[in-house]
Each structure stands twice: as structure tokens, then as C-alpha cells.
């Protein structure tokens, strides 16, 4: 397992990469098709771009070493949501446009003792970056 989220930047980055890899595998096992990873634009970043049936899904992955300070999903606020939406818009415009069904999900990965815990929050925020109802 990667270093703690509260440590140095390299440890946080390693934890994030490990969480993203685990989230991608978890989603793929459930039938999601992974189209892209770590899509960066000047306006933001999307961790995973997937297809869930006919729906284009943009996934923000959040990882922590414990849930002691709340779940990783709680760290996705409106500003982060808007940045994901902006990067997702750029991606969609280059891959079929905005006329397709689009959803914004969060996958929370908590590393601790034993197996990592993966939680999926479909439609975690809307196209304006506002939190959904989990």
C-alpha cells in the first residue's frame, strides 16, 4: 500500500495512483468500459472516463488511508465538481459531443488494515458541479 494521505506529496500521489488503479479495476469488474485515465486540460482533470452501457461516465477517484476524518467522497466539493465538469466537457467535445447521456460519479477508496474498501457513488454531482444525493 502507498504512503499516508497526510504525509509528503509523493506519498499522496502514490496513494492517488493506487486508488485510481483499484477503482478502474473495480469498475471494469462491474461492466464499465474504461475509455481514458487522468485526462488533463487547463481547466481541470478527470481521473477516469468510462462507459456504463450507453452512458458516458466521468469518475472522480478519492483515496484515504482511513475514514477517521470522514470518507474520501466527502472531499469532493462544488469547486472540485466544477473542475471535473469542465475537463469532462472538453473530453466529450473531442469524443462524440455533449448530446450523449453523461453522468458524474465518485469512487471512494479507503486503505487501512486488510483489504481496501471501494465505494461507488453514481451521479455524485450534476453538470454544474453541485453535489448529488447519495
Swiss-Prot record:
Signal peptide: none
A Pfam family: UPF0102
GO terms, molecular function: nucleic acid binding
SUPFAM superfamilies in the cross-refs: Restriction endonuclease-like
Taxonomic superkingdom: Bacteria
Family statement: Belongs to the UPF0102 family.
The protein's name: UPF0102 protein Adeh_1910
Species annotation: Anaeromyxobacter dehalogenans (strain 2CP-C)
Classification of source organism: Bacteria, Pseudomonadati, Myxococcota, Myxococcia, Myxococcales
Amino acid at each position: 500500500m502507498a504512503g499516508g494521505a497526510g504525509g509528503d506529496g509523493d506519498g499522496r500521489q502514490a496513494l492517488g495512483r493506487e486508488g485510481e488503479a483499484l477503482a478502474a479495476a473495480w469498475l471494469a469488474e462491474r461492466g464499465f468500459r474504461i475509455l481514458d485515465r487522468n485526462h488533463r486540460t487547463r481547466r481541470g482533470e478527470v481521473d477516469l472516463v468510462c462507459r456504463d452501457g450507453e452512458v458516458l461516465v466521468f469518475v472522480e477517484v478519492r483515496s484515504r488511508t482511513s475514514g477517521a476524518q470522514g470518507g474520501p467522497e466527502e472531499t469532493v466539493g462544488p469547486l472540485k465538481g466544477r473542475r471535473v465538469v469542465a475537463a469532462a466537457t472538453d473530453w466529450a467535445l473531442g469524443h462524440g459531443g455533449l448530446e450523449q447521456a453523461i453522468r458524474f460519479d465518485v469512487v471512494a477508496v479507503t486503505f487501512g488494515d486488510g483489504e481496501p474498501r471501494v465505494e461507488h457513488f453514481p451521479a455524485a454531482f450534476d453538470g454544474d458541479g453541485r453535489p448529488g444525493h447519495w
